[in-house]
Amino acid sequence: MSFRLRYAPSPTGFLHIGNTRTALMNYLFAKHYNGSFIVRIEDTDLARNVDGAIESQFENLNWLGIFPDESIFNVGDQKYGKYMQSQKFDRYKQLAEQLVNQNKAYRCFCSSEELEKDYEEQTSKEIIATKYSQKCLFLTQDQISQNLKDKKEYSIRFKVPQNKVWTINDIVRGDVSFDSKDLGDFVILKSNGVATYNFAVVIDDYDMQITHVLRGEEHISNTPRQMMIYDAFNWNYPKFGHLTLIVDNTGKKLSKRSGNALFFIEQYKKQGYLSQAIFNYIALLGWSPPGEQEILSQNELIKIFDEKRFSKSPSTFDMVKMKWINSVYMKKLEDNEYLEFVKSFINTNKFDITSKSEAWLNHLLLLYKKELEYAEQINDHLDLFFNKNTLDNNTIDVLNNLTNYKNVVEIFKNQINDLKDWTIENIKQIIKDTSTLANVKGKDLFMPIRIFATKSEHGPSLADVIYLLGKTTVLNNINSLER
């Protein structure tokens, strides 16, 4: 059997961590077994559809390296039907009417006001699991004919079988059972002719010959309704699996309101995260590889994927770990790849790099290759090189705690002033000579030089920073601070 798995987003929002994890796990599952990964669009909720959401889904999936074998842009065999639900309304309506004719569904003429009144009556009796009253199930054929003649609006409700239990062997959770007594007759076709989610999704999965449905745990409650529909058509079920929640550091479901994490994939792109790092990290949310290795390429993840290794517990989205994994991938880039990538994230409105040579800029950026967690972070380090640093009182306190710092600075300044050949090796030698002449070392040597020469307590290799600042800037910094 060829495995066919799908990711089926609604265009009501943009690609985020949660639905990326769903897409990614389906992709890994399909590719591990040399199967097909399908993306279809579930756009029946027309009022909530967002402009640009479909494009966001595909652009960001492709950026992450998740390429569908079939989609609205890459249509498969015609036997699989359409890849967008709004193009299948006739198909859904035909099958809903078929169930009515087979006495497995019925027309419901109840108005929204009648349904609301029914709901209020049940809640007033403290009924927790409210259900449809089945009022229209018992209409006579004459009543139905009269309603149709009067052109009274109706939806189509599925008739839930009585006294039946459905059990699935969930890929993630094991056996899960559902009892029909907990479910009321539900709408499968709304009065506007649009199929409901549970009806459309079953037809789509059947038409596309989906073998495994892997999705978020919020869909568990939909599963019994979908199984009933499969049974009504005498269709075989796919294999179901429900991934556990992704939570934030407070234990709440990860959302755009989670303060500790970026939620949308587009945000990671804009901050300069690498797509392969995000792919790697999200693959570890609710799934664990064998062994201790956590830095895994897409091909490695496909090779070692095992659906038996899904977690039954919620997974916490750890922004610190996300940054760490991205920093590992940043370090693995070739220097030319790293430079091209990071340059595109420099804030050129704040830092005028046009006045600098390419060699100078490359030298500067490579100093931070082992430090950056994401590319946009480079802007946190550039004040140092564009004379935008200011010292505070804490820095003055640091100086006052050092041994004879004024002598150290004076010796260093005189030697820098006399230096003719401006190279890193010569600057390193001057620092050594200053140590000997001032009879200091360690913090008493480096801190005064760093603060006066660079106007900062912190930074990468001192000799490299001094070299990049240039002789004139270094002497100006020292003179301004001495005053």
Curated annotation (Swiss-Prot):
Positions in coiled-coil regions: none
Any one GO CC term of the record: cytosol
rRNA-binding as UniProt keyword: no
CDD domains in the record: GluRS_core
Keywords recorded for this protein, A-Z: Aminoacyl-tRNA synthetase, ATP-binding, Cytoplasm, Ligase, Nucleotide-binding, Protein biosynthesis
Catalytic reactions on record: tRNA(Glu) + L-glutamate + ATP = L-glutamyl-tRNA(Glu) + AMP + diphosphate
PROSITE patterns the record matches: AA_TRNA_LIGASE_I
HAMAP family: Glu_tRNA_synth_type1 (MF_00022)
Subunit structure: Monomer.
Family membership noted in the UniProt record: Belongs to the class-I aminoacyl-tRNA synthetase family. Glutamate--tRNA ligase type 1 subfamily.
Physiological role: Catalyzes the attachment of glutamate to tRNA(Glu) in a two-step reaction: glutamate is first activated by ATP to form Glu-AMP and then transferred to the acceptor end of tRNA(Glu).
Record's protein name: Glutamate--tRNA ligase
